[in-house]
């Protein structure tokens, strides 16, 4: 039951053409009807979200996003801004930490209180020589960077929630990477997880128990259904929503659905 989760919502996290602001507004209204409370802006093909994350969003976009935030307030749905800097990130670069915080703050100024840092779909090892010299592995670097960003942002703005997507976001929870993330990450940061697979046919209760134990916090699920990007682009996923254990709210904090490009 979705109502059992503290965080209930939608992550616009697919590859392909992003929704328009009008489509997002319709999504917010539908989310309110379904008693959802969080929408996350994270379209992979928005260059300023991912590949050009250091570039500020133009004023016109921020003004349109402010209208979306206000629309969300009317319907009881928080609108979160996610950034995905991992493809070009130097984890130990204080200038890049500052750049990311500044970009978040540009949305804090228009009323955003929920923020996300996504480090998914990037290499599993450190790519920059300076990071290889400064950190023992990817997990240590990500813990350092994420904690720095969160603590600076928290000191400068009103943060209700901060969600982190790890580079290993599905499968085996008994890994050294997740162990380091769990022990080192600030306890107030939420961690995202897609389940046994990237697109999980089923999400059993045991999965939630295991990954929440590994990460030392109740996980927030990023459920890649009914998303139909990539090799699934020719498909429409309109079948019944099944295979999710009804006990999941007992071992996880939230559930975000990654929808189809054609969702509305």
Residue ranges and their predicted role:
Residues 116:
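Hydrophobic "anchor" residues on beta-strands that sit immediately upstream
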Residues 47, 119-125:
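Short, conserved phosphate-binding/catalytic loop or strand-edge motifs used
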Residues 83-85, 121, 225:
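Short, histidine-centered active-site or binding-site loop motifs used for metal coordination
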Residues 13-14, 113, 125-264:
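Catalytic-core regions of glycoside hydrolase
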Residues 1-105, 109-113, 154:
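Feature activates predominantly on carbohydrate-active enzymes
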């Amino acid at each position: 039951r979705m109502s059992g989760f503290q965080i209930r919502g939608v992550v616009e996290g697919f590859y392909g053409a992003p929704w328009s602001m009008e489509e997002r507004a319709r999504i917010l209204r539908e989310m309110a009807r379904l008693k959802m409370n969080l929408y996350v802006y994270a379209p992979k093909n928005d260059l300023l979200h991912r590949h050009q994350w250091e570039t500020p969003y133009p004023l016109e976009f921020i003004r349109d996003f402010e209208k979306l935030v206000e629309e969300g307030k009317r319907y009881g749905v928080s609108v979160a801004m996610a950034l995905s800097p991992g493809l070009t990130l130097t984890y130990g670069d204080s200038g890049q930490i500052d750049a990311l915080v500044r970009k978040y703050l540009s949305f804090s100024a228009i009323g955003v209180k929920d923020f996300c840092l996504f480090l998914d779909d990037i290499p599993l090892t450190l790519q920059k020589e300076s990071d290889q010299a400064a950190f023992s592995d990817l997990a240590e670097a990500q813990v350092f960077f994420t904690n720095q960003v969160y603590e600076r942002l928290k000191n400068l703005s009103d943060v209700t929630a901060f969600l982190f997507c790890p580079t290993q976001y599905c499968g085996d929870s008994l890994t050294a990477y997740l162990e380091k993330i769990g022990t080192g990450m600030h306890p107030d940061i939420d961690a995202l997880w897609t389940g046994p697979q990237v697109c999980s046919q089923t999400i059993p209760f045991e999965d939630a128990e295991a990954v929440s134990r590994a990460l030392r916090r109740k996980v927030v699920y990023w459920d890649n259904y009914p998303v139909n990007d990539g090799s699934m682009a020719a498909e429409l996923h309109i079948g019944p929503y099944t295979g999710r254990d009804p006990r999941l709210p007992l071992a996880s904090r939230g559930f975000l659905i990654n929808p189809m490009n054609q969702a509305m």
